[in-house]
Structures are given as structure tokens and as C-alpha cells.
Amino acid sequence: MRAEQGDILRVSGINWPVIVVSNNHFNAIGEVIVCPILKNIPGNAVHLPIRAITPSGEIEGHIACEHVRHLDLNERRYTKVYSLQMTDYLDISDTLIALFDFR
């Protein structure tokens, strides 16, 4: 199973879910760029709310878009728990682009 953009993962050694933000071309090598989904942070311009009902329970919190991390999934166990629709992913994508908008 390969992780894809918009997937919410549970990864061994990480206590919170993460969302895959890297594109599928990059993800094909087994590495991903992710942002954490955290419960105890306030919403703001870079903390986007998320609520997903999964077979294993509910994921609710904020995506911390400023906490971008690289993970090598070839070296970690992980489980895909949910996949966002592309329309739901657009706010995340827009926020990440805005963080790196060089002028």
C-alpha cells in the first residue's frame, strides 16, 4: 500500500495522525511530506480544522500546516485511516503554497 496525497496516516513512533501533503510522484519512492493533526492547538490561518469519521473512530483537530515534516515510510510502519477528497484538500494546499510564496 502506497501513501497518497490527502491520506491521513497513523505512523509508528508518532502519537498523532498526520496528513500527506506531498504529491503522488514524490510519494512513489516511499517517502512523504506530512503535517500533523493536533487536538490542543487553536485554529488560525495556518491551523486548519479537520474532522473525519473513520472505521477506527473520529479524527478531530487542526492541521498544523507550519509543521511540515519528511517521513521515510520504507522505515516505519503505518496505517492509512482515511483519504480526503481533493476538494477537501484544496484549503490545505492553498495554505502550504502561501507559506512558501516568495516575493
In which residue ranges do the predicted regions lie?
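Conserved functional hotspots at enzyme active or ligand-binding sites that engage polyanionic ligands
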Residues: 1-103
